[in-house]
From Swiss-Prot:
GO terms for biological process: translation. This is Small ribosomal subunit protein uS7c. InterPro entries: Ribosomal_uS7, Ribosomal_uS7_bac/org-type, Ribosomal_uS7_CS, Ribosomal_uS7_dom, Ribosomal_uS7_dom_sf. Part of the 30S ribosomal subunit. The lineage of its organism: Eukaryota, Viridiplantae, Chlorophyta, core chlorophytes, Trebouxiophyceae. One of its GO terms (cellular component) is small ribosomal subunit. HAMAP family: Ribosomal_uS7_B.
Length: 156
C-alpha cells in the first residue's frame, strides 16, 4: 500500500450480454490464468441454468444471491499493548460485494464431481434463498463481530 497517494478506483465496464457490472465482477473473479472467455462461458451457462430452474430473470437471482452473502461487518486484528484484539469494522459496499463473490466462488471451487457451471448454479440458488455455505460464512463473520463488539472502541 502506497504512502504517497491513494489509488484511483477503476471503473468496471458492464458485461456484453446482461449489461451488468455485477456479472462482470463475477466473471473477473471466476477467471483463472487469463481465460476470460472460459469464465464468460461458465457464468452465462450458469445463468441460463438459473433461468431454467426458477423461470425468473437470472440477473435478479444473482443480485439477490450476492446481496444475501454480503457481510455488513467484519473483524480485523488490531494489536494494542501487547495483545491482539479482533476489532469489528463496518464493511464498505464495494468490499462487501467483492467478499460475497469471492465466498460464493470459493464454495463452488471446494465442491468436486460436477462442472463449475452446475456448482455455481447450485450455490447462487442457495444464496438467493438465504441458505448455502457462502451465507453461512457471512453469518459466522457476523457472529464473530457481535462477540467482539466490546473491542469496537479500538476502531482505526
Amino acid at each position: 500500500m502506497s504512502r504517497r497517494r491513494t489509488q484511483k478506483k477503476r471503473i468496471v465496464m458492464p458485461d456484453p450480454v446482461y449489461d451488468s457490472r455485477l456479472v462482470e465482477l463475477l466473471v473477473r473473479q471466476l477467471m483463472r490464468e487469463g481465460k476470460k472467455s472460459l469464465a464468460y462461458r461458465i457464468c452465462y451457462e450458469s445463468m441460463n441454468r438459473v433461468a431454467d430452474a426458477t423461470q425468473q430473470d437470472p440477473l435478479v437471482i444473482v443480485e439477490q444471491a450476492i446481496r444475501n452473502a454480503t457481510p455488513l461487518v467484519e473483524v480485523k486484528a488490531r494489536r494494542i499493548g501487547g495483545s491482539t484484539y479482533q476489532v469489528p469494522l463496518e464493511v464498505a459496499s464495494e468490499r462487501g460485494t467483492a467478499l460475497a463473490i469471492r465466498w460464493i466462488l470459493s464454495v463452488c471451487r471446494k465442491k468436486t464431481g460436477r462442472p463449475m457451471a452446475a456448482k455455481l448454479t447450485a450455490e447462487l440458488l442457495d444464496a438467493a434463498k438465504n441458505s448455502g455455505l457462502a451465507v453461512r460464512k457471512r453469518d459466522e463473520i457476523h457472529k464473530m463481530a457481535d462477540a467482539n463488539k466490546a473491542f469496537a472502541k479500538y476502531r482505526f
